[in-house]
């Protein structure tokens, strides 16, 4: 999977979970803006696992490392 494919998949998951298209602002803080909450985080991790085979235990989820679309894409790319 290319970097563009990964980015598109992550943005699609975020859009499905939040109802928001965040592709135009990859640095928006999803938590501060109320776009994503703790339940959404768990759903995000489950969808990343289902769609991309990325496993991130909830216990290892550091909110500050996953708070923008750009950070999420970078984390996923590092874990692939």
Curated annotation (Swiss-Prot):
Residues 1-80 form the Carrier domain. GO terms for cellular component: cytoplasm. It is found in: Cytoplasm. Pathway: Cell wall biogenesis; lipoteichoic acid biosynthesis. NCBIfam families: dltC, PRK05087.1. 4'-phosphopantetheine is transferred from CoA to a specific serine of apo-DCP. GO terms for molecular function: D-alanyl carrier activity. Keywords: Cell wall biogenesis/degradation, Cytoplasm, Phosphopantetheine, Phosphoprotein. It comes from the Bacteria. The keyword Phosphoprotein applies. The gene is dltC1. This is D-alanyl carrier protein 1. The keyword Cell wall biogenesis/degradation applies. The modification O-(pantetheine 4'-phosphoryl)serine is found at residue 38. GO terms for biological process: cell wall organization; lipoteichoic acid biosynthetic process. Pfam families: PP-binding. Belongs to the DltC family. Carrier protein involved in the D-alanylation of lipoteichoic acid (LTA). The loading of thioester-linked D-alanine onto DltC is catalyzed by D-alanine--D-alanyl carrier protein ligase DltA. The DltC-carried D-alanyl group is further transferred to cell membrane phosphatidylglycerol (PG) by forming an ester bond, probably catalyzed by DltD. D-alanylation of LTA plays an important role in modulating the properties of the cell wall in Gram-positive bacteria, influencing the net charge of the cell wall. PROSITE patterns: CARRIER.
């Amino acid at each position: 999977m290319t970097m563009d494919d990964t980015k598109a998949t992550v943005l699609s998951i975020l859009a499905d979970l939040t109802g928001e298209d965040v592709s135009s602002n990859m640095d928006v803080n999803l938590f501060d803006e109320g776009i994503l909450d703790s339940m959404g985080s768990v759903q995000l991790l489950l969808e990343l696992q289902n769609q991309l085979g990325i496993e991130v235990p909830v216990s290892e989820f550091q909110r500050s490392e996953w708070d923008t679309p750009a950070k999420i894409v970078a984390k996923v790319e590092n874990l692939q």
